[in-house]
């Protein structure tokens, strides 16, 4: 593996993407069988991509797959296996020295495993023995709230519904979820603003909009199929404007791999008509600057007798809180807005002008907006901006949060939440004949805090890499090994499995691409994409191992063992997933005719009240919500520091690292790097390729013990006073206390640091 730093000249997509897919296929897959399966991905009769949550177009290409989707499926259907012989040769202690890429690259898990402390190895056992032992441990706890039930966004609606049903019959609302670490500010912030914790747009709205503002996200790496929609809107004359600390190739230009002309001529489409490098932590200041200019210009237009820039009728009819917002933004000083955002008043005026001129605007955002101490307020400022011109609830306009995992939104819809509504619990109890717990449970941060204090005794993980994804890894590693029970439902080995509890189990499950055969035949599961479309997913490949079970079957097996007097007919439900969907429909009325509607190509759309201008808020209207001040990260407010954000590389999906390259940013064969602007490098007196140390700072600006040593400097076009490193290696630079008090999301995108040369 050759290490080099070399500027990448190509557009996003193109032959670079094709070559990357070919390499992934060559290294992981049986080309004769498995590559054919890619043609079934994101198709009505096929399986849903296990990667991102970008929706499927109604009329998709014959090969509707992106580079990172291809990597995800190649990673899943690899012919490499992690079995008993693998663990006979590798102790847990030795595996802890492996890199995270190496661990997952070892292959698919194919049989149930139990950790043996004497040999320091995982050893195989039967499914029934695993279920019985796990059930016995769960029965031994005096308080159901001593168990944490973690969920990954790869879990299907059916498995997630059974999982929450099991946990609630057991007696707990402890549901730490991967969404707590990515888009919880969306769920909390949008619900308070517009009454629905989800985006309001459909894919068709991108065909009708005049302007798309992309802020705080990187589609070229995190949701590449979005580039096709951006390309199409630019081709028809609409505009896209990018706001991001780094220049990301996927926001700049794109060569569509499915377009023969662009591929053969090596041509490309310019995406962003303008690109603004806001400083890390400067989004709120920028947004308030835009709103101030809009209000001032609207006032001037009114005084001169010209038409209003704002949608006064919409504001008066559909909203409350505008007067308070108006006072707040007009009191924001330009010197502070410019200092915090890193953009000039002139640049912000350009943005405001573009927004004012557009009749229909969509704002797309990702974790660059959410992963801050005031991430919830960030989301609400985006809503405020849209509400000012009536850009919610009309075609071609709205708010578009870009979710990560393919079903992270669906899991929440069917009950994976630590704060369930009274109505949901009443319907659940009525359907099954038991009284669910009503006390709020733990989200991710509270869950890890309970583990660290010894309050929690057991952790069950439905997928994911909980230990690696959380902040303050060094502080939490030892407490995780002091748990009484750890159960990991997984397809591949990861670091969380190696932090073994007194009783640790790995339970292997089918991948999204594999045939799920139950008593009544092959089963389909369902997922919900970022735009609230529900559709079926049917595996087409032979399972990687004969002992693999479905997630639904694993949940049912544990539940039957842990709850011998259960009121739920677990085995009956798993025989035919239509039965699970019938129960979901009974508990959640929005899923009416569930089984009938998922049999239609493309599935169905869950009604979004806000998109219809029905505001399910206490006020009965959409709320302008004011956030005091300009700082989205108060603990980073002092001036004697740099601010670091964590990001994925291009060869990565969440904690899964497919390879060591970050092609679009010009990094190859390595991950121990720190990105900074040429201006910042000059200020810090460092050069491209030099090694530096980063030391995390406390809220009062003092050096902490958390550090990253010998990172290679990569000079990159980006905002000053901003540094970028890779997630999850840099997660330990953040404490569990550094999170948004409203949503609980960790502040991964704004960590105060100090830089020093390495010796």
From Swiss-Prot:
| Key word Oxidoreductase present | yes
Q: Which cofactor does it need?
A: [4Fe-4S] cluster; Mo-bis(molybdopterin guanine dinucleotide)
Q: Name one GO cellular component term.
A: membrane
Supply the source organism's classification: Bacteria, Pseudomonadati, Pseudomonadota, Gammaproteobacteria, Enterobacterales
Stored Gene3D superfamilies: 3.40.50.740, Dimethylsulfoxide Reductase, domain 2
Oxidoreductase: present as a keyword of the record? yes
Name the UniProt record assigns to this protein: Protein YdeP
Q: Name one GO biological process term.
A: response to acidic pH
What does the entry say induces or represses the expression of this protein?
By EvgA.
The UniProt annotation places [4Fe-4S] cluster binding at 49, 52
> One matching Pfam family, short form?
Molybdopterin
Protein family (similarity comment): Belongs to the prokaryotic molybdopterin-containing oxidoreductase family.
UniProt keyword list: 4Fe-4S, Iron, Iron-sulfur, Metal-binding, Molybdenum, Oxidoreductase
Q: Which InterPro entries match?
A: Asp_de-COase-like_dom_sf (IPR009010), MopB_CT_YdeP (IPR037951), Mopterin_OxRdtase (IPR006656), Mopterin_OxRdtse_a_bac (IPR010046), Prok_molybdopt-oxidoreductase (IPR050123), YdeP_MopB (IPR041953)
Q: How is the cofactor bound?
A: Binds 1 [4Fe-4S] cluster.
The role this protein plays is: Probably involved in acid resistance.
Q: Name one GO molecular function term.
A: formate dehydrogenase (NAD+) activity
Task: Provide the species name.
Answer: Escherichia coli (strain K12)
